[in-house]
Amino acid sequence: GFIHGVMNTDNMSVAGETIDYGPCAFMDGYRHERVFSSIDRQGRYAYSSQPGIGLWNLIRLAETLLPLLAIDGSEAVKIAERYLETYKDQYESAWLAGMRAKLGLTAGAGSDEEDRGLVGSLLDVMDASEADFTLTFDHLGRLGADPSGHDEEACKLFAQREQFVDWLAKWRERLKRETQGDAARQAGMQAVNPVYIPRNHQIEAAIRAAEDRGDFSVFHELHALLQDPYVEQPGKERFRLPPEPEEMVTRTFCGT
């Protein structure tokens, strides 16, 4: 659920990493079109736009490399296009592998089309309720293949409860084709779905304590917690929670 905020060409490295993080965040409530820069009113760098922006940036890079690819300009363009055309499949393959892991699914037990649809429908349900991204996957990693009392905690995240309950039934139907048991599946999901993320309101609290009061203890506690974000730690429940309305960081710019 990470949003760079301003993922333009100078913030994307040829090493395959985005850099220069300013108005960035790990999402709290999920929205396809969530942005994290107050000046991004058109949603150019929205969460769902990031894959396309990645390709756009690579096209700009390819344009600068055309003189090195071939002496003939049209031939150079063809070479660049041949490589750029592989981006979509490579991205979608990596995305599906990551999302399957988050949902405890394996490639051999379901088709790519089916599993892509299952993931997409979950994101739609999350979007409709603005369900917390991290907590949703964390709760799913605690559920069994059969309904149990743990379902209720996950359902509380969804204002559109029935939509999530319907999706949950489809997910469990898909799980029946998996060969691993609940314990192994849950362990795998918990290894890729963090319990804690650096939520913006917690980062802001650490900054305010340090700058306003010279108190770095809030920063050190948060920093220590995030060294092992996949393991639930006693007494740290508050770090799992999304912000209260008055805690939300609503204005972010480059440099914040």
Predicted regions and their residues:
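Regulatory N- and C-terminal appendages and interdomain linkers associated
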Residues: 41-256
